[in-house]
Amino acid sequence: ANALLGGTDAVLIFDESGFAKKGEASAGVARQWNGRLGKVDNCQVGVFATLCRGDMATLIDARLYLPEDWCNDDERCKKAAIPEDKRLFQSKTQLALAMLKIARQRGIQFGYVGIDGGYGKEPAVLRGGDKQGYRFVADVHCDQTIYLQDPEPLVPEWSGRGRQPSHRKPQSAPQRVDQWA
């Protein structure tokens, strides 16, 4: 894949897909959002990494999303033949970040990462990728709020009344994407 599609003009795209299911025995099946159907339904969800350049693309990694209820049910996991080391809950964004790290370790070359609004709304994805030195093209929801500069969250000074503050708060106000753009 890297020899044919890798390079600084390539993009590594992350997305998920739902697979409708009737029963409850398939690994990871649950009532959850199925983007292919456009509704919450009984399904499995996979997170996929695709390397693209021009009009060519290939799948380079895929992970089954295992809902937290599944991870906490050893008997159900055994029946579905899920190995013990795979029963640790990871959000879809955590799966995508893990695949991003593995792609780089494998030497996959790409100029930037593309993600849809489901991942673009997650600060952990953008921060995690930014810390690793990646450039992103991220779809975001129009009502998502953003900071144009680091909000420098701090614990506010105690006013002398009520409980003493313990949670950090941003020092600047966020803006909605549709009002900024």
Predicted segments, located by residue:
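Active-site-proximal, Lys/Arg-enriched surface segment
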Residues: 1-68, 78-79
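An internal, acidic/charged active-site-proximal segment
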Residues: 75-181
